[in-house]
């Protein structure tokens, strides 16, 4: 077992096609845009420039995160390291909101309900029918999951609940070996992890936004608590600007 500090890097996938269109995405599997591919590559360049080179990657089973990991590793010349994919790192399932325009949803339901669905810790959107257009209930990549583990909607509390077992069972053991671990995932699965790492309250987590394509570096002590609370963005100026853009999602038409 290696001694602390342990090195952890979080990377939200680059801009996706539905990010660009301002649609709720969730478990719908969409590609990166050309801009998103550039963001992912830039993320890898930032890792290389900082000398923060991952030894292993954990990502979701959604191609926007998988592709982000691939592009970042290519840019950092670390394309040869192990990559582990798991559904527990998937984006939050947005239920019946999946595929809906955020600005139209805001206009239809009002800001209070919109923000409750989007940012509250424990209020999920309406459930998505199993046979709906944007349902993943019959997706073959989830065939091994019992029905009760295939969500039809989720709040962030649900994401924390399904993500933490993977953190303890898969990511922590890699950190304990002294490996630098890259988690390439999604806005809400990463918010769930940051909530756990930084001990953010259920109320305060609503204000946390994570930008696309900018690595967030943590050093963790022996109890896996941050030595740098909140983490350190490898491009702080770009991160600050991108966080403002994330805050304004839903207002864009």
From Swiss-Prot:
One GO-annotated biological process of the protein: glycolytic process
Keywords assigned: Gluconeogenesis, Glycolysis, Isomerase
PROSITE patterns reported for this sequence: PG_MUTASE
Native organism: Streptomyces coelicolor (strain ATCC BAA-471 / A3(2) / M145)
NCBIfam families, per the entry: pgm_1, PRK14115.1, PRK14120.1
EC numbers for this chain: 5.4.2.11
Presence of the UniProt keyword Isomerase in the record: yes
Keyword NADP part of the UniProt annotation: no
Catalytic activity entry: (2R)-2-phosphoglycerate = (2R)-3-phosphoglycerate
Residues marked Transition state stabilizer (site): 186
Gene from which the chain derives: gpmA
Cited InterPro entries: His_Pase_superF_clade-1, His_PPase_superfam, PG/BPGM_mutase_AS, Phosphogly_mut1
Residues binding substrate: 12-19, 25-26, 64, 91-94, 102, 118-119, 187-188
Record note on quaternary structure: Homotetramer.
Protein name: 2,3-bisphosphoglycerate-dependent phosphoglycerate mutase
Enzyme kind, highest EC tier: isomerase
Family named by the database record: Belongs to the phosphoglycerate mutase family. BPG-dependent PGAM subfamily.
GO function term, MF aspect, one: phosphoglycerate mutase activity
Pathway assignment: Carbohydrate degradation; glycolysis; pyruvate from D-glyceraldehyde 3-phosphate: step 3/5
Summary of the function given for this chain in its UniProt record: Catalyzes the interconversion of 2-phosphoglycerate and 3-phosphoglycerate.
Family matches, as Gene3D superfamilies: Phosphoglycerate mutase-like
Active site: 13 (tele-phosphohistidine intermediate), 91 (proton donor/acceptor)
